[in-house]
Amino acid sequence: MTDTGDRTHPAVERVEAALRAAGVEPRVRWFETATPTAVAAAEALGVEVGAIANSLVFTFDGEPLLVMTSGAHRVDTAFLGERLGGRIRRADADTVRAATGQTIGGVAPVGHPEPLRTLVDEALADYPEIWAAAGHAHTVFPTTFDELLRLTGGEPTPVEGPASAG
């Protein structure tokens, strides 16, 4: 069950402010229970898991890198690192918090202290509406692939190599 009630949280407020600044009316939905995974969010929304845009933070040569991936995919770090010409590692919780101002399970594509280099999984273009976390594990907001690219300044890319796709 979701609602758009009067709940607040500082990280969610920052996401809403970032959306408004980009000319997008925030439509944040709150869940009664946390939805920290793509499967949980998809079940709560009644959508395909591929329509969930996971916000995953990695480090690329020591700098934070946000990868927005379809909930149906796993990021192939070797493949992506090779495409980018460097090494990608999963960020720890402290790095995620410092880079985004949000905690793992609720990281949004926007509302961070500073803009992050962002890669967006091309597979998200397969869905007319996609859902991303809104700064808290109990929240999501709807967007589109094109809007997500615009909001994040993201680079569309595959996130799975040929051997890992399937």
Spans of features found by a protein language model:
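Extended, low-hydrophobicity, polar/charged segments
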Residues: 1-166
